[in-house]
Amino acid sequence: MASMITVDFENCFIFLLLCLFSRLSYDLFFRKTKDSRAGCALPPSPPSLPIIGHLHLILFVPIHQSFKNISSKYGPLLHLRFFNFPIVLVSSASTAYEIFKAQDVNVSSRPPPPIEESLILGSSSFINTPYGDYSKFMKKFMVQKLLGPQALQRSRNIRADELERFYKTLLDKAMKKQTVEIRNEAMKLTNNTICKMIMGRSCSEENGEAETVRGLVTESIFLTKKHFLGAMFHKPLKKLGISLFAKELMNVSNRFDELLEKILVEHEEKLQEHHQTSDMLDMLLEAYGDENAEYKITRDQIKSLFVDLFSAGTEASANTIQWTMAEIIKNPKICERLREEIDSVVGKTRLVQETDLPNLPYLQAIVKEGLRLHPPGPVVRTFKETCEIKGFYIPEKTRLFVNVYAIMRDPDFWEDPEEFKPERFLASSRLGEEDEKREDMLKYIPFGSGRRACPGSHLAYTVVGSVIGMMVQHFDWIIKGEKINMKEGGTMTLTMAHPLKCTPVPRNLNT
């Protein structure tokens, strides 16, 4: 689960202009000149403008495309500056591999939180916490209780129930000839799945709880745009940038806190009555109350973990489902081949299940190819200490931006990189296990790499695979117009600029 940071620079342009005068004043009157490190060179840097640095290069094109274009022109390892905000941009598989291998601990922390006490992007967030005792404890806990193979096996029935509910929703819309916005419906599915896996029940649609959670998740993701912008500055301008959205951030955080506190109290009362744990939240509360626990977690850390899981776990999978279905609908031959595989292995009278996935290699290849072309987002980290990469000097506290989008479209590693070709992963699966693992570490990193890679990648593959399999197995998909608009959205989280809307048509009604 990687951390999902989004930013739309076009909408922020006016704000940036307002900051120019402040930035210039700071440089002229307050900033002290620092001696450069003798004998050391920063990575190459494209031509920049006074004050704003390289910001003009990424204002009007989606950020992943902008960075890909910059790297294609100037090189795979670059030093960029947005105002006073230094970034090392990596767009090469080999360079990224070297960093995660040689500097894994050094780049295992993410940028510091803008507001410590916020449940969103705050210091209690698992995604944003520095690498240390808390991050190691929580990752171990999540693997054991939620995301590891044994934990996923225990929660398999939850996902099967939600998949069946999703199928019935699509079937109902199909019978009524209603159009489906794929991402919205997938968000409901992933939200319910995550809720049930964490706390044993889904958020209620009847009392508006589910809609509240989805709304808060959407607002939280939107606020990360402003966080990224505010983080571009160093003191005192950083405080100014953050203060402009602090009230809004805390408002969303407080509403999340109110909702999650009710859920925690509900579970505490259940634990007092039954004296046994039944889900991940119960186990977290048990650890919270245990004075002899391996790590003494706080109540805010439990709540922030929920926010992290809701935000990263629901949006990333929903976006991947939407992108992959768009590619399948665009390519009828691929769709037909996938159906033939599913029909031969699963049949036509039951839904695809998770246990079928190992026997559906083409479906697995389609999911991998969807993630290759449309990865959830970049890897954003911070260099904790000064180091050397490819002979270049990297100062401490420099931000690392690994453009996963560019790496997984690198023509040096991928044949026809802009084409949707699932067969490439069938070929790679014939490699020896060690060769395949090394090749993937080099060029295929949709969920990041190293010790802070997304721990939920296996769950994502499982959910996306079973959902895509069911949607192709049981429905034809009719779109309005001649073709699907595949334009990418202008955010760091890779979204479709025009949401995929289509009408499901049942293939058979014997399920």
Swiss-Prot record:
Localization, UniProt: Membrane
Record's bilayer topology term: Single-pass membrane protein
Names of required cofactors: heme
Keyword set includes GTP-binding: no
Tissue expression summary: Expressed primarily in the root epidermis.
Binding positions (heme): 454
One Pfam family here: p450
TM segment ranges: 12-30
Coiled-coil region: none
Phenotype of gene-disrupted mutants: Increased levels of thalian-diol in roots.
EC main group: oxidoreductase
EC identifiers of the protein: 1.14.-.-
UniProt cross-references to InterPro entries, sorted A to Z: Cyt_P450, Cyt_P450_CS, Cyt_P450_E_grp-I, Cyt_P450_sf, Plant_metabolite_P450s
SUPFAM superfamilies reported in the protein's UniProt record: Cytochrome P450
GO BP, one annotated term: flavonol metabolic process
GO (cellular component) term, any one: membrane
Gene3D superfamilies: Cytochrome P450 (1.10.630.10)
A GO molecular-function descriptor: monooxygenase activity
Keyword DNA damage attributed: no
Note from the entry: Constitutes with three contiguous genes an operon-like gene cluster that is involved in the thalianol pathway.
Protein name: Cytochrome P450 705A5
Species of origin: Arabidopsis thaliana (Mouse-ear cress)
